């Protein structure tokens, strides 16, 4: 009697993200201290953010504006009434021993973001809530990158009181790729709107991952584990992939999954246990008594909605539908607001959209990457790039000549046409000028000419090269090919 081996169970990840974004206000959420990154430790502090007795918080109006704009950009419902709460916990970088946040009545709820995946699929990720809170300070550990193993720790309170929004997703994410793309799309949207600079390395955008595993198709959630300390999009993806495999192995071995917070170690490419995961009851939330409720009017919403720019997802669709660009090109050009604005200015100046895209994604992108520059930093104006593209289309210069003069235009600016004329680079499109040069090329290469006429037609490229050399690259390629073909076959 034989018994069939049980089918191997397939598992899926259930992932939700909590993304903390520092708002790009010049002053803190409840006080007037500056928020600039990189200032000397404890030079951007005041009695309010230090929690000194007798101080009272006052909400920075810009924080409310930016939070509502973020909610609108993320397709959320804006609450007409919300409030602040105290989140109670003790940690050395939290001077008041509580954090002012929002608990049961956040500023925005029920939003969504659509992401594009590498296989061409799109997926909508739900947003549960978006709430406002203050950031904590920062611990600097001597001799280690975390508390464990350090000889002592210092506290920098510059970050305490910096305004944050926390964006909590629905558990709609299934893979590390989806998670990384979701965070990138959030970053694009917030940067476009001028609400957050999205710098993961500086901590202005931080992501915590909540992940559990379950058999594929099961409606039941597994035990959730939180992962922290990921400072790049790749790290988010790798941490999720590692943790998924770790949890699956534990489940298959019959080991329990502990609800805990784990730390992603970049050097060892693994997660390690950090602490037991707290529940919301551990924080003993209660309404903040020193701040009034927040009220957002329909007029405020309408005004802030009107001030939002066209967002990247809308640009991508428009570039494909109006300009006929590919999905890849549309995504590249809309990824950063500076890039998109430059591209649109080039097209507005009369350039063919596909030609403009090709130049920006190849030669100009290479120059920017090499010199670590962005479009506002270069001397090449959009109108000049459009002029350069026009010179190629008119047959005034070849693409080769355009590539040769591009670095000078990028560094010094000026008129493309004037530079071409000053350097004598105008394309030779007159057959009466090219014919004598072709005759010279053939006369100078009798051996190759004989081989060509005996059937070695691959030498045609050699003759094209010799003609281009003689004309210093100025011969009209199409005309040169036609004339050479006629002379060689004649």
Swiss-Prot record:
Coiled coil: none annotated. One of its GO terms (molecular function) is ATP binding. GO terms for biological process: glutaminyl-tRNAGln biosynthesis via transamidation; translation. The keyword Repressor does not apply. It holds the Pfam family GatB_N. Signal peptide: none annotated. Keywords: ATP-binding, Ligase, Nucleotide-binding, Protein biosynthesis. InterPro entries: Asn/Gln-tRNA_amidoTrfase_suB/E (IPR017959), Asn/Gln-tRNA_Trfase_suB/E_cat (IPR006075), Asn/Gln_amidotransferase (IPR018027), Asn/Gln_tRNA_amidoTrase-B-like (IPR003789), GatB (IPR004413), GatB_C_1 (IPR042114), GatB_Yqey_C_2 (IPR023168), Gln-tRNA_amidoTrfase_suB_CS (IPR017958). Its EC number is 6.3.5.-. It catalyses: L-glutamyl-tRNA(Gln) + L-glutamine + ATP + H2O = L-glutaminyl-tRNA(Gln) + L-glutamate + ADP + phosphate + H(+); L-aspartyl-tRNA(Asn) + L-glutamine + ATP + H2O = L-asparaginyl-tRNA(Asn) + L-glutamate + ADP + phosphate + 2 H(+). Heterotrimer of A, B and C subunits. Allows the formation of correctly charged Asn-tRNA(Asn) or Gln-tRNA(Gln) through the transamidation of misacylated Asp-tRNA(Asn) or Glu-tRNA(Gln) in organisms which lack either or both of asparaginyl-tRNA or glutaminyl-tRNA synthetases. The reaction takes place in the presence of glutamine and ATP through an activated phospho-Asp-tRNA(Asn) or phospho-Glu-tRNA(Gln). Belongs to the GatB/GatE family. GatB subfamily. This is Aspartyl/glutamyl-tRNA(Asn/Gln) amidotransferase subunit B.
């Amino acid at each position: 009697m034989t018994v069939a081996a049980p089918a191997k169970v397939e598992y899926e990840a259930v992932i939700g993200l909590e993304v903390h974004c520092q708002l790009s206000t010049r002053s803190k959420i409840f006080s007037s201290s500056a928020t600039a990154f990189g200032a000397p430790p404890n030079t951007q502090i005041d009695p309010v953010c230090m929690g000194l007795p007798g101080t009272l918080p006052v909400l920075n109006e810009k924080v409310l504006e930016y939070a509502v704009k973020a909610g609108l950009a993320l397709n959320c419902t804006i609450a007409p009434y919300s409030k602040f709460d105290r989140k109670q916990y003790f940690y050395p970088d939290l001077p008041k021993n509580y954090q002012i946040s929002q608990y049961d009545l956040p500023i925005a709820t029920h939003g969504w973001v659509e992401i594009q995946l590498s296989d061409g699929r799109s997926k909508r990720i739900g947003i549960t809530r978006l709430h406002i809170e203050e950031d904590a300070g920062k611990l600097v550990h001597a001799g280690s990158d975390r508390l464990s193993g350090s000889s002592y720790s210092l506290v920098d309170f510059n970050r305490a009181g910096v305004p944050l929004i926390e964006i909590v997703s629905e558990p709609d994410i299934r893979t590390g790729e989806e998670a990384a793309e979701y965070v990138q799309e959030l970053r694009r949207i917030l940067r476009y709107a001028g609400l957050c600079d999205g710098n993961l390395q500086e901590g202005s955008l931080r992501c915590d991952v909540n992940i559990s595993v379950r058999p594929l198709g099961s409606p039941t959630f597994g035990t959730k584990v939180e992962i922290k300390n990921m400072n790049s999009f790749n790290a988010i993806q790798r941490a999720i992939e590692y943790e998924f495999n770790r949890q699956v192995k534990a489940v298959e071995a019959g080991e329990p999954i502990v609800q805990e917070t784990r730390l992603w170690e970049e050097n060892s490419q693994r997660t390690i246990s950090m602490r037991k995961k707290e529940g919301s009851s551990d924080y003993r939330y209660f309404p903040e008594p020193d701040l009034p409720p927040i009220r957002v009017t329909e007029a405020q919403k309408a005004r802030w909605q009107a001030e939002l720019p066209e967002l990247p997802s809308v640009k991508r669709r428009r570039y494909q539908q109006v300009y006929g660009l590919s999905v890849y090109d549309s995504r590249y050009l809309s990824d950063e607001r500076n890039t998109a604005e430059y591209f649109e200015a080039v097209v507005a100046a009369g350039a063919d959209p596909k030609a403009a895209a090709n130049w920006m994604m190849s030669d100009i992108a290479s120059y920017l990457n090499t010199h670590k520059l962005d479009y506002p930093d270069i001397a090449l104006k959009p109108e000049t790039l459009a002029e350069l593209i026009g010179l190629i289309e008119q047959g005034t210069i070849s693409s080769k000549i355009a590539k040769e003069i591009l670095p000078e235009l990028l560094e010094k600016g000026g008129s493309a046409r004037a530079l071409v004329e000053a350097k004598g680079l105008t394309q030779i499109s007159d057959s009466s000028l090219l014919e004598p040069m072709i005759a010279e090329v053939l006369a100078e290469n009798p051996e190759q000419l004989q081989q060509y006429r005996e059937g070695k037609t691959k030498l045609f490229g050699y003759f094209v090269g010799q003609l281009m050399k003689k004309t210093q690259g100025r011969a009209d390629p199409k005309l040169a090919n036609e004339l050479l073909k006629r002379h060689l076959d004649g």
